[in-house]
Amino acid sequence: MGLLKTTAQALLLSSTCLVLWPLAASAKAIPVELRQTEQGWQLLRGGKPYFIRGAGGDGSLELLAAAGANSVRTWGADDIDARLDAAHALGLSVTVGIWLGHERHGFDYSDEAQVRKQLEAARQTVLRYKDHPAVLLWGIGNEMEGFGEGDNPVIWKAVNDIAAMVKKLDPLHPTMTVTAELGGGRIDGVQKLCPAIDIHGINTYGGAPSVAERYRAGGATKPYVLTEFGPLGVWEIPKNDWGAPSEPTSTDKAAFYRRSYESGVIGAPGLALGSYVFNWGFKMEATPTWYGMFLADGARLGAVDVMTELWSGSPPTNLAPTVEPLVIEGESQLDPGDEVRVRAVITDPEGGAIHVRWVLRRESGEYATGGDFRPVPPEVEGAVLEGRANGARLRMPRDPGPYRLFLYAYDAAGRAATANVPLLVKGQVRTPMPFYVYQDGFEGMPWAPSGWMGSTDLLTLDGDHAGNPHEGKACIKMHFVGEVGTWVGVAWQHPANNWGDQEGGYDLTGATHLELWARGEFGVEKINIGVGLLGQDKAHPDSAKTTVEDIRLKKDWQRYRIRLKKLDLSSIKTGFVVTLSGRRPDATIYLDSIRFIRK
């Protein structure tokens, strides 16, 4: 899981800390040593025993240090200079992430050119940051093995090659790689295929209390760090009749944080070197409240109190409110416009006043995102008719589909508690429009630009180009250096690299057009655009295919549409296709706001 990014994108974890410590020219790396003693494995930093009390996320480093933590983790290393300086100024170390590509984002570990480029990027990261005094470990990859068996030897070779290079460049900081849990070939991959990896980083949620036992049973001997742990994962909780999971309350989650830390971290002396709790900040994943230890407005939840006590030995003087699971009066499956009542029980440990906010949102329906960015579903305005500390009354929307009612309970000190309950409006569900293929970046979009065709070695694709987007913060830049007579194409696929051998796709029934904005660098570039690519000869075809050919772009942004009426849009696995013809000296085009609409 974690804060993932696409292969071409970088993760910037910004700090809210305002006090920076410019790295002096005379600053030196603090040596970190991994030592095996009679009692087991031990980490030494600056010659002194060092147990990692850390967190991952983009929340305040000042609050993290004040809570008793001593370390922070990043998933990538782009533009982390300020974060390293801020961490060092606060006495925090940093496990610096070296992002490795994911196959589901289009990275191909059998492509030697991609692997070489990735290794060189890792080299530059190490050379840039190895002497910074905040650096603790190198985190080489995060769940790059994927969510299957995790036993692809080509991936493990790439990991080990990078780790071996890192050790030569920087003998002062140990190497770690991070896997999604321990199943399949993950233990053997790290233990047997990666001799240059010193530490096994483990992302585990429901399995955190038993991780030490399972790790030993799998034959592992290297030390481990819990690199992500938190509440039960969305995949670990049963779903209701329409496929929605019941999210634990913030109070129940806090209790599970404690259990995981006491069993999987401090309960495994000599094997566990510490941990990084997830997520120190706010994160939309499955729901807006599932994984974050803070709300979007900065309010601290009960998990912060628990970790403060576990790190520092003392709980905060003011604790977050507690909340019991919400209770629906009547049915949870309702007709459009029905009224429903929900009961709540909230307690403030100090006996103070509580104020509440009730919010109804459409359910995201995306529960297995692997940490990829997703936008927060909008609030359904006017749905909550009455909201109190002991319950709420609401009127369900007219649009059929799944929804979720959220309770946010605050005390006067900026602490909060959350609970929610899924609800369903009966009737035929239609995909909300507009439905974006691209909006301000590749990350978090339904389809991945993974289907490269033609002279792909001559193409560069940038989904975060900030120069003159049509709207928002970024647009797509395609730069092709092929000669006249050559061509290149990119298909947006779901899931990534789906050439018809996988299930997937989206039901876009009701969409009338695919709409996009495009321009050319010189106003002479020619493109073809389309929806759908996979024919009936494939095991899992697109339900429709259509193209618009020989579009000559202009230098200014122009809107283009593909008519979709009367097409079967029930299963679109290839959301968008663009091909670009070569020209002298090169061809550069820009695309923005690619979306399905209903007119």
Q: What are these model-derived regions, one by one?
A:
Residues R35-E38, L44-I197, S210, A220, ...:
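Active-site mouth of glycoside hydrolases
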Residues Q428-K599:
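Beta-rich carbohydrate-recognition modules and glycan-binding surfaces
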Residues A419-K426:
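C-terminal edge beta-strand
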Residues R341, P402-F406, H513, K573-G575:
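Short, conserved beta-strand segments of beta-strand-rich sandwich/propeller modules, principally
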Residues E181-E213, V234-D241, G281-P288:
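Substrate-binding cleft/loops of secretory-pathway carbohydrate-active enzymes
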Residues R395-G401, K565-S570:
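Short, surface-exposed loop/turn segments at beta-strand-coil junctions that are enriched for proline
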Residues T37, R45-G54, A65, R216-F373, ...:
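Substrate-binding clefts and catalytic carboxylate motifs of secreted carbohydrate-active enzymes
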